[in-house]
Amino acid sequence: VRIEKRYNDEIGELTDTINYMAGEIATTEQMKNEFISSVSHELRTPLTAIKGWAETLMLDGGNSPDTMNKGVKVIVTETERLQQMVEELLDFSRMQNGHFTLQSATMDILAELGDAVLIYSEKAKRETKEIIYDEPEMLPFVFGDKNRIRQVFINVIDNAVKYSSAGDRVTIKAYESGENVVVSVRDTGVGIKQSDLAKVKTKFYKANHTRRGSGIGLAVADEIISMHGGSLSIDSEGEGLGTTVTISLPAQEKN
């Protein structure tokens, strides 16, 4: 619904503002609908795989060790995917309701980053992708929730691997910059259109609809980093030119 603009004075400006707000509401509603459709699809896909392989194993999996191993591997992988998605949805709900809290303490950011890199190193290798991480010997400690920070690293590295193709590289760096500890994750994957860059951290938004994902992971990650007094930025030169995610957190003051 749009209001016809009849004047070029204050009334006209008000008309423009109302029309703009109406457009934003319509866009948000469309994004929510797309989000619900996307999540339904994302839940259905692993459930279908789990059900299919469970039925296969019940029928004749015991007669073939290869079939058994393959089926169990698929079930475990898809179950982990479901678990990650449910956790993202729960976190998103808590943030919306103001019930999301941090359990902060002095933490070693390299330990959490190292765990996240380890989780995806083998996955990347299986997909003929390369993760390059030259871990520094030491960085200042950070005051934060180590589980939530690790969650952010996992989300960002997962995206970098997911939106890359065979032969692509994911380069991870951690360093001190002024009073901050910085982690950058750069991939040589599909990249992001300039018109999408400002929207990728928006709730429900998916820049690439051909890859799996709920569209809320980055919104949750961005909120977690903001709650730590830090920043999460996303840069890309364009489609096919890769993406760089930079996470900056305030270093804990040395006594």
Regions found by a protein language model. Name each.
Residues V1-Y20:
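HAMP signal relay modules and closely related sensory coiled-coil linkers
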Residues E4-R6, Q103-D108, K125, E130-P140:
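Conserved catalytic submotifs in the C-terminal HATPase_c
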Residues V74-L82:
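Short alpha-helical segment of the dimerization/phosphotransfer core of two-component systems
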Residues N97-L102, F141-G144:
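Conserved micro-motifs of the catalytic ATP-binding
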Residues G167-E179:
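Short beta-strand/loop element within the Bergerat-fold HATPase_c
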Residues I192-F204:
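Short conserved segment of the HATPase_c
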Residues G229-G230, I234:
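Conserved glycine-rich
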